[in-house]
């Protein structure tokens, strides 16, 4: 048990980098478009929407270009809100999208399609890293583009969109096809480290609220940071110190050498259930209420937590790997 305890603590430190430094949770969106590409609102109003609705950070990720954020400070930035540059590297292999977000690039990005879908994705990832950015794989099930087979051989990437607001993203399993959560467990069960992101992929800020539109405010992440800065947010995302949500708010997520604990922030009279999930998507424990905990056995390979609410909202906590 002592050896297991040491291994879990080492993994927690390596993946989440916890320390005694005071931290807080900050809410943000990693995928949004403006009229600089195919969004229907100008960048300053995109920034203003997220600022006004209580977000602390936003990446504007227009297609194949970096939307300059410094000039938006007067309209976007506030004491508790920052804009971070981004770009959606928009590659295709044959008819299949291979889109990769570059979060906080330091320079313009150039990338080309490869000879396979996996190579094309890797080209986008490598281009993001060369620019000093954090790569994020976007909407794998959009047009049923790529899955765990294509993702398992990728290098230098940990973020992928588990939930994308767009109607065509096929987030859930149906018709014999795996949803994004099934892809996630398939990868984790191979011992591969991937962290789940929920994002708006916002394109539509104006007009009627019709089902086919990609409106803001439906998918987001909360990152644990010691300070609100681009570097701190990107570091938290890259090491998985965040949770993804479609509406559920968490008060805290804590992992010790003995347990994985989730504390939920209640909304109205909503009821909550937490699932602790392991290898091959196996449910290890189910617990109702605002506080849920799972005691490690030592043979799980990994443990992640999923919180779902009676109003249909969900939160996804990141996996912790356990090695004997």
Predicted regions and their residues:
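A metal-dependent hydrolase metal-coordination microenvironment
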Residues: 20-149, 153-156, 162-183, 199-202, ...
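Short, hydrophobic/aliphatic alpha-helical segments
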Residues: 179-193
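Alpha-helix termination/capping residues and helix-transition junctions
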Residues: 11, 52, 151-154, 190-191, ...
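Hydrophobic h-region of N-terminal signal peptides that target proteins for export
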Residues: 10-18
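C-terminal functional module detector
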Residues: 19-21, 190-195, 200-324
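Alpha-helix boundary recognition
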Residues: 51, 129, 188-189, 238
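Alpha-helical transmembrane segments and their juxtamembrane interfaces
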Residues: 12-13, 41, 72, 211
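Sec-dependent signal peptide recognition
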Residues: 2-8
């Amino acid at each position: 048990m002592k050896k297991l305890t040491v291994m879990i603590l080492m993994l927690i430190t390596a993946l989440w980098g916890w320390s005694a430094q005071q931290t807080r949770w900050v809410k943000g969106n990693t995928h949004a478009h403006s009229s600089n590409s195919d969004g229907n609102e100008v960048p300053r109003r995109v920034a203003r929407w997220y600022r006004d609705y209580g977000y602390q950070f936003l990446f504007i990720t227009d297609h194949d270009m970096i939307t300059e954020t410094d000039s938006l400070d007067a309209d976007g930035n506030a004491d508790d809100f920052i804009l971070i540059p981004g770009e959606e590297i928009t590659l295709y292999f044959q008819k299949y999208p291979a889109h990769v977000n570059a979060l906080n690039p330091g320079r313009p990005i150039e990338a080309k399609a490869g000879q396979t879908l996996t190579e094309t994705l890797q080209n986008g990832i490598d281009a993001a890293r060369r620019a000093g950015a954090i790569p994020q794989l976007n909407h794998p099930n959009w047009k049923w583009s790529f899955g765990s087979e294509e993702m398992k051989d990728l290098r230098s990437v940990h973020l992928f969109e588990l939930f994308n607001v767009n109607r065509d993203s096929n987030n859930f399993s149906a018709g014999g096809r795996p949803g994004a959560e099934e892809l996630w467990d398939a990868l984790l069960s191979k011992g591969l480290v991937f962290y789940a992101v929920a994002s708006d992929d916002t394109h539509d800020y104006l007009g009627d609220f019709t089902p086919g539109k990609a409106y803001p405010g439906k998918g987001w992440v909360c990152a644990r940071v010691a300070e609100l800065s681009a570097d701190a947010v990107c570091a938290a995302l890259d090491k998985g110190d965040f949770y993804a949500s479609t509406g559920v708010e968490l008060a805290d997520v804590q992992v010790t050498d003995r347990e994985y604990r989730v504390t939920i922030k209640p909304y109205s009279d909503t009821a909550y259930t937490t699932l602790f999930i392991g290898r091959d998507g196996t449910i290890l424990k189910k617990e109702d209420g605002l506080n849920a905990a799972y005691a490690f056995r030592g043979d799980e390979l990994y443990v992640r937590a999923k919180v779902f609410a009676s109003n249909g909202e969900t939160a996804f906590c990141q996996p912790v790997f356990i090695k004997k």
